[in-house]
Amino acid sequence: MLEGFQILVQNTVQGTIHKIKCVCDSQMSVSEMSCSESTSACQSLEDGSVPEILISLLYNATNGRLSAEVIKGSHLKNWAANRPPNTYVKLTLRKSTDQEMSKCKISIRRGRPNPVYKETFVFKVTLFQLSHVTLMLSVYNKSSMRRKMIGWIYLGLNSSGEELNHWTEMKESKGRQVRRWQALLESR
């Protein structure tokens, strides 16, 4: 059972830090996170036909923090118009019972098929809970009238294939960031 959790959002593009407290007892600063920047170059998985998202995962077992950095998107399309999309990403953390624990949203990146997000979300999740949660990332195109989902992925309990490999490697990495391109499951 999750006692409480806290989310820190750092927008590294604009240099601002936002704290969102959700059913929590304590505050934490970004300086308390032990994130190490990966020096390896990451290349997109696909040739341009599939929308993708570059995600970095980190779990710190010492303080029970799950960090998910949404770095950038690639080949995101605007199905409704012949212009680049205005995109944002929504992260939803769910228990094994499919009960929503938390949701957060990245600010909109306007007119970019390959947007750079560089926003980090930190969730408090104990080590024994880590195998029983799912992180869903949904990418949306926002127009003046409505929003349309471009695609989504699951990481964690309800994932498979490359998404499950990413999650498993993060759990076994002993506090090291694990970056991967993930192909979005398209929603038309």
Curated annotation (Swiss-Prot):
Tissue spec: Expressed in mature peripheral blood neutrophils (at protein level). Expressed in heart, pancreas, liver and skeletal muscle. Expressed in umbilical vein endothelial cells and melanocytes.
Gene Ontology biological process terms from the UniProt entry: cell differentiation; positive regulation of CREB transcription factor activity; positive regulation of dendrite extension; positive regulation of ERK1 and ERK2 cascade
InterPro entries xrefs: C2_dom, C2_domain_sf, SYT14/14L/16
Function: Plays a role in melanocyte differentiation; enhances dendrite outgrowth, melanin content and tyrosinase activity through the modulation of ERK and/or CREB pathways.
Residue span(s) of domain C2: 49-182
Induction and repression of expression: Up-regulated during neutrophil differentiation.
Domain comment (free text): The C2 domain is necessary and sufficient to promote melanocyte dendrite outgrowth.
GO molecular function, one term: phospholipid binding
Family annotation (PANTHER family): SYNAPTOTAGMIN 14, ISOFORM D, SYNAPTOTAGMIN-14-RELATED
Keywords for this protein: Differentiation
Keyword Disulfide bond: no
Family, per entry: Belongs to the synaptotagmin family.
Native organism: Homo sapiens
Record's protein name: Putative synaptotagmin-14-like protein
